[in-house]
Swiss-Prot record:
Organism: Mycobacterium marinum (strain ATCC BAA-535 / M)
Subunit structure: Monomer.
Coiled coil residues, start to end: none
Protein name: Dihydroorotate dehydrogenase (quinone)
EC number(s) from the headed UniProt entry: 1.3.5.2
Native organism taxonomy: Bacteria, Bacillati, Actinomycetota, Actinomycetes, Mycobacteriales
Length: 360
């Protein structure tokens, strides 16, 4: 059924469909009785799926990745869609329109998306007001980025301002320095640039702070960011963002679409590689959230057993439909029971030793 609906929706421009579908989801979950019914039906109800991570209780490990609900206008929607949590944003200290359209493209042969949205959002202040007015049934993290017009040498103050506004209201904060769609942003992943940003955010809030990294980092850069995260006392790392690589894509004409980051299956292999590397290096000290190319319950299970305590998806939701998160959670629960695991935590990293030696 959803396959037919998806084919019809894919006849329309992607960003228009996003706005339409998002509006429908918000409308369908606006009434409290309906929302509660959907949450009971679609949500992760098996106790084995629940876990407490950096002091926050998550009913299920799969969350909505940042980018879908940029301004937190669907805060009451995501539990009813079966997610164990949601990450809203990316928001910036100042409102901004993002990049000119068209800026979102489908790669159907790859079941992927290409976007160059550019952090279009209403600002951290507007999100803070929404967070203060709503009490979602699942944890809500906030992803913060740099305002495009803010010079790199003022990035610390920009991130600090966002953290001050939304930090007290979020379940956790993610410092996004890995989007390819804000000029110069990825340069902030260099340790000498990243250190003062993370230190400023940590000083501004007692909320757990994580950093989101790109799949295109070299292994040595991944190691340096991981070591910095441990040194500063971050809660964890989100790995990974979209990739700028075009290697192996099947959809014709991708080269004519222009710049942007690709999400979905094309990033899956590298995302898993980065996860494995991080777990071997800092998995005993940091929480790892895996995102990038998760489509099936088997994909999700691979990430958990490789070291991810939590998972996120966006593109899989687009291609998988409204039952996607339920199918993922049901599949994880089934594998936990079949494997004799008493909890999700017991399964995290259970297959890591078979994936290679720790990095030198």
């Amino acid at each position: 059924m959803y396959g037919l609906l998806r084919r019809l929706l894919f006849l329309l421009p992607p960003e228009r469909v996003h706005k339409l579908v998002f509006a429908v989801l918000r409308g369908a979950t606006a009434a409290t009785p309906v929302r509660r019914m959907l949450t009971r039906w679609l949500g992760p109800t098996d106790p084995v799926l629940a876990s407490t991570v950096f002091g926050v209780r998550f009913p299920g490990p799969l969350g909505l990745a940042a980018g879908f609900d940029k301004d937190g206008t669907g805060l009451d929607t995501w539990a009813a869609m079966g997610f164990g949590y949601a990450e809203v944003g990316t928001v910036t200290a100042h409102p901004q329109p993002g990049n000119p359209a068209p800026r979102l493209f489908r790669l159907p042969e790859d079941r992927a998306l290409l976007n160059r949205m550019g952090f279009n959002n209403h600002g951290a202040g507007a999100l803070a007001i929404r967070l203060a007015r709503h009490h979602p049934e699942v944890p809500v993290g906030v992803n913060i980025g740099k305002t495009k017009t803010t010079p790199a040498d003022q990035a610390v103050d920009d991130y600090r301002a966002s953290a001050r506004l939304v930090g007290p209201l979020a379940s956790y904060l993610v410092v996004n320095v890995s989007s390819p769609n804000t000029p110069g942003l990825r340069d902030l992943q260099a340790v000498e640039s990243l250190r003062p940003i993370l230190a400023a955010v940590l000083a501004e809030t007692s909320t757990p702070v994580l950093v989101k990294i790109a799949p295109d980092l070299s292994d040595s850069d991944v190691d340096e960011v991981a070591d910095l995260a441990v040194e500063l006392g971050l809660a964890g790392i989100v790995a990974t963002n979209t990739t700028v690589s075009r290697d192996g894509l099947l959809t014709p004409g991708v080269g004519q679409l222009g710049a942007g980051g690709i999400s979905g299956p094309p990033v899956a292999e590298r995302s898993l590689e980065v996860l494995c590397r991080l777990y071997q290096r800092v998995g005993d000290r940091l929480t790892l959230i895996s995102v990038g190319g998760i489509e099936t319950a088997e994909d999700a299970w691979d990430r958990i057993t490789a070291g991810a305590s939590l998972l996120q998806g966006y593109t899989g939701f687009i291609y998988g439909g409204g039952l996607w998160s339920k199918h993922i959670h049901d599949g994880i629960a089934r594998r936990l029971h079949q494997g004799g695991f008493g909890s999700l935590h017991e399964a995290v990293g259970s297959n890591a030793a078979e994936r290679g030696r720790p990095p030198s």
